[in-house]
Amino acid sequence: DGAKAYTRFKANEIDLNRDAQDLSQPESVALSTFFNKFKPDFCFNLHGQRTIFSAGNINKPATVSFLAPAQDEACTVTDNRKIAMTIIVKMNKNLQLQIPKQVGIYDDAFNINCVGDTFQSYNVPTVLFEAGHFEGDYNREVVREYIFQSLLIAIHCIASNQLDGEGYEDYFKIPENEKRFYDIIIRNAKLKLDNKEQILDIAIQYQETLVDNAL
């Protein structure tokens, strides 16, 4: 029902990405059961990201963002996080050739209720992907290509055993996401407020909804 309504909240208002510990929903139980049965060596955590984010203090959108989720309150750089960071560094190198300065790092504040943080806490290298915004690409068709490329690079790194934890330090050179954008800004609009005419900028933020199964 969450997908049908274009939200990760279910009809009962439960956010599945905050249910990794409580396991109150059948979907959460199914994922946890499969994780414990399959015992993955790596986990990929895929998200969509709103249009408001930049990659650092720059006038460009964050087209793709990554995160090696924290696994404790101290955000300790554990061995499995180093491996996740190394994967991100390799993906970022490819993307910088195509969308320079449009790759960011998402906030790594620890929340054990999130699926990615939970999987990382089990000492499994976990990489979070955020499909962000490319100018004019509200259906994320361009972004989809960059996510696909990144997945291929990540899988190649794993399959070719290129992950010894070396080079993870470059992860910290990737700028963090900042909230810097609106979808539309109307400049120098004349408004009458409190019987006084004022010139203001008006910012508009889109709300993504499905209409006839289209975004």
For every predicted segment, state its role.
Residues 38, 72-75, 84-215:
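C-terminal accessory segments enriched in acidic
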Residues 1-88, 92-101, 120:
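Active-site/substrate-binding loop(s) of hydrolase catalytic cores
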